[in-house]
Amino acid sequence: MSQTTTTSASETLGFQAEVKQLLHLMIHSLYSNKEIFLRELVSNASDACDKLRFEAIDQPGLLEGDGELAIRVGYDKAARTITISDNGIGLSRDEAVANLGTIARSGTREFFSQLTGDKQKDAQLIGQFGVGFYSSFIVADKVTVLSRRAGLAANEAIRWESDGQGEFSIAPAEKAGRGTDVVLHLRADEDELLNGWKLREILRRYSDHISLPIRMAKEDWDAEKGEQVKGDELETVNQANALWTRNKSDITDEQYREFYKTVSHDYDDPLAWTHNRVEGRSEYTQLLYVPKHAPFDLWDRDARRGVKLYVKRVFIMDDAEQLLPSYLRFVRGVIDSADLPLNVSREILQESRDVRAIREGSAKRVLSLLEDMAENKAEDYATFWTEFGQVLKEGTGEDAANRERIARLLRFASTHDGEQAQTVSFADYVGRMKDGQDKIYYVTADTFTAAANSPHLEIFRKKGIEVLLLSDRVDEWMLSYLREFDGKSLVSVAKGGLDLAELADEEEKKRQSEVAETFKPLVERLQQALAEQVKEVRVTQRLVDSPACVVVGQNELSPHLLRMLKAAGQEAPEVKPVLEINPDHALVARIRDASDAEFGDWAALLLDQALLAEGAQIADPAAFVKRLNGLLLKA
């Protein structure tokens, strides 16, 4: 937008190691979709103008008498360059070094650890990470950035330059107008981009929704030269109004998808979106998207969260996490409020009644979107659940007002089909309950395999009663808030004295009573031998194929949760389990006849194998092996 000259005091610096790695990966993984460079650079230019507009609310002098913000795209066939210019906030020297030479964001190490070498998969990850400015090097073998931050003098501009190979130079420069010019020196095989029609086509496809005017030199056909020739007049090539302010009927699905890619910097299309204008107690417009893939930093506490916040179409901040509850932190998009003050801060957002109304309304809108997807687009919902199901489970504790709605959206693995895929809803389970059954049964474990092979399931399989198999880390926390569904209690098959009386006939009840009396002496011997390790020993009806299992009280922390707490360095109470024995198992019969000299070893072996089957670590593995070998030699 303005001519620039540089002084000679240039300094050469090295890229951060992660930048070099990202540049190499990006050039090789994203080349098939190389046109995104223009989308990314125009998006950056738009952000720079938004930030200037926001800072100028308190410092109007930053506008320097030029309040018409715009983006300009030009090309020079002779020089083989494309230039993207803006008159936004600009960069100081320190900002240029920080923003153009390093990746200053959390989760960088996790991002690189997930790269596989598969171009398609890595392209998706790189897209999630956000390539931004570095996408320039997909099509350019040298990039020059000329920038002056608003408020600095003309001779305090900077010139940044790099070939993307590992180093960049930065030098003082003079620049009459504020803002940034990004000059791409194209690679030898990128001639097709030196074409006004091609650039306009890319801009209209990827950046039509940008609210600022994107201008290019008007071109007319020159019959003598046989080509389009640029004139001095500029024309706006995009619609230049905020997409979310338009009527839904005037927006195509493709425009919605491209807007998502701009606000999220995602490489892939969104899974679903909702666009609404809300009027009443609080007036705002929301355009919210559910991504198709979870970001690599979904579980990083310091990662970016939330949506873009605008007030009366003026950009206020990125990642306004207060506008959505934490369990919907994967949602991307824009919320434009008509009621919040323009000088709103993050502190005000935490206390504002209007923000609470927006958060509640937006949560309900996203849940409605998910409900519609679950009911009408089963494959899409299965994709959503695989990517974000564990996060949605957090909502059972965080959002009491919507707990029932969230519960209906949950999906689990189940003994119904024995598959690891989490496809069973509570409604599915209730619809298959046996006559007389009034509880929803579940088992928790460290892994799906451990849950599916839990000895606690044996009696349920025998009776044909379905059990939900829960192995996500969040499940135990979720269950502390979610106690029932549709009036039916959620009951762990590994807690308390299992009551299946409603499913047993009179003859079976009589037999159970007789067996308990018959095995009373053995129970007392085991109780005495294991007094230090267990709270109680009792005969069980929950086992069919296993000799014993351990359970805890109905209101005690499960062994699975205790292990999680200890692994996280948290204090965990010592809970003595109850040992339940299977009176019909041959090993129990063998122990019943054991001599006093051997009984202690048999009792300890029975407890240790029950603990191992439950997924616990036994206190003394060496003693367990020695004891087992000794008893095997005597067998």
Swiss-Prot record:
MF terms in GO? ATP binding; ATP hydrolysis activity; ATP-dependent protein folding chaperone; unfolded protein binding
Q: Is Cell inner membrane set as a keyword in this record?
A: no
CDD domains according to UniProt: HATPase_Hsp90-like
Subcellular localization(s) per the UniProt record: Cytoplasm
Q: Where is this region: C?
A: 564-635
* Signal peptide residue numbers: none
Where, by residue number, does the polypeptide cross the bilayer?
none
Gene3D superfamilies the record matches: 3.30.230.80, 3.40.50.11260, Heat shock protein 90, C-terminal domain, Histidine kinase-like ATPase, C-terminal domain
Asked whether the UniProt record includes Nucleotide-binding among its keywords, one would answer: yes
Q: Name one GO cellular component term.
A: cytoplasm
* Main location class: cytoplasm
Top-level taxon in the UniProt lineage: Bacteria
Renumbered to this chain, region (A) spans 1-346
Annotated segments matching region B: 347-563
* Keyword set, alphabetical order: ATP-binding, Chaperone, Cytoplasm, Nucleotide-binding, Stress response
Q: Which InterPro entries does the annotation name?
A: HATPase_C_sf, Heat_shock_protein_90_CS, HSP90_C, Hsp90_fam, Hsp90_N, Ribosomal_Su5_D2-typ_SF
Function comment: Molecular chaperone. Has ATPase activity.
Q: Enumerate the HAMAP family for this protein.
A: HSP90
Q: Which family does it belong to?
A: Belongs to the heat shock protein 90 family.
Q: How does it assemble?
A: Homodimer.
Query: Which PANTHER family does the UniProt entry name for this protein?
Result: HEAT SHOCK PROTEIN 90 FAMILY MEMBER (PTHR11528)
Q: What is this protein called?
A: Chaperone protein HtpG
Source organism of this protein record: Bordetella pertussis (strain Tohama I / ATCC BAA-589 / NCTC 13251)
Tell me the name of the encoding gene: htpG
